[in-house]
UniProtKB/Swiss-Prot annotation:
Domains (record comment): Forms a beta-barrel structure that accommodates hydrophobic ligands in its interior.
Full protein name: Prostaglandin-H2 D-isomerase
Quaternary structure, from the entry: Monomer.
Keywords tagged on the record: Cytoplasm, Disulfide bond, Endoplasmic reticulum, Fatty acid biosynthesis, Fatty acid metabolism, Glycoprotein, Golgi apparatus, Isomerase, Lipid biosynthesis, Lipid metabolism, Mast cell degranulation, Membrane, Nucleus, Prostaglandin biosynthesis, Prostaglandin metabolism, Secreted, Signal, Transport
One Pfam match: Lipocalin
Localization: Rough endoplasmic reticulum; Nucleus membrane; Golgi apparatus; Cytoplasm, Perinuclear region
Enzyme Commission number, as recorded: 5.3.99.2
Organ and tissue specificity: In the male reproductive system, expressed in the testis, epididymis and prostate, and secreted into the seminal fluid.
Role played: Catalyzes the conversion of PGH2 to PGD2, a prostaglandin involved in smooth muscle contraction/relaxation and a potent inhibitor of platelet aggregation. Involved in a variety of CNS functions, such as sedation, NREM sleep and PGE2-induced allodynia, and may have an anti-apoptotic role in oligodendrocytes. Binds small non-substrate lipophilic molecules, including biliverdin, bilirubin, retinal, retinoic acid and thyroid hormone, and may act as a scavenger for harmful hydrophobic molecules and as a secretory retinoid and thyroid hormone transporter.
Superkingdom in the source lineage: Eukaryota
Organism from which the protein derives: Bos taurus
Lineage: Eukaryota, Metazoa, Chordata, Craniata, Vertebrata
């Protein structure tokens, strides 16, 4: 019969090995040969997926927003998003700083003062772009989000299906995926 110390040690080793064998969350690939100049211009945020408790609570009241990507003076990108909030159009600009290979950026969250990494995982530049964002919002509050950008307010069904597959490949569940409804406000078609 094994001694209590040996049983404890065996359980500890099994636990450590089990943790080491637990797969890490999937990482999004990066768009090969990303061409930043083709990524510039107007996009509509058409779909989101997240593990954030805030997102899961608020996803039913979110609506599509318009974003404009423009070059920044320091070589990064300005991402200016206009969205409906409390029946008013609100505009916010984030500075996306280059953070590695082309298509990989970082920004400081205005709400949490934490750094988030965002990467353009896939795009055809003319129809859609799939983005992946991750960061930490506080102790034990990892933040991950997949975003579907589309050049029009009506992304094709195949694009939506492709986004769903992308989001699920990153570990997001059906409950954490939402396609944002269009709104008549704040969505002018011109840039």
């Amino acid at each position: 019969m094994a001694t209590p110390n040996r049983l404890w040690m065996a359980l500890l080793l099994l636990g450590v090995l089990g943790v080491l064998q637990t797969p890490a969350p999937a990482q999004a690939a990066l768009q090969p040969n990303f061409e930043e100049d083709k990524f510039l211009g107007r996009w509509f945020t058409s779909g989101l997926a997240s593990n954030s408790s805030w997102f899961l609570e608020k996803k039913k009241v979110l609506s599509m927003c318009k974003s404009v990507v423009a070059p920044a003076a320091d070589g990064g990108l300005n991402l200016t998003s206009t969205f409906l909030r409390k029946d008013q159009c609100e505009t916010r600009t984030l500075l996306l700083r280059p953070a590695g290979p082309p298509g990989c950026y970082s920004y400081t969250s205005p709400h949490w003062s934490s750094t988030h990494e965002v990467s353009v995982a896939e795009t055809d530049y003319e129809t859609y772009a799939l983005l992946y964002t991750e960061g930490v919002r506080g102790p034990g509050q990892d933040f991950r989000m997949a975003t579907l950008y589309s050049r029009s307010q009506n992304p094709r069904a195949e694009v939506k299906e492709h986004f769903t597959t992308f989001a699920k490949s990153l570990g997001f569940t059906e409950e954490g995926i939402v396609f944002l409804p269009k709104t008549d406000k704040c969505m002018e078609e011109h840039p």
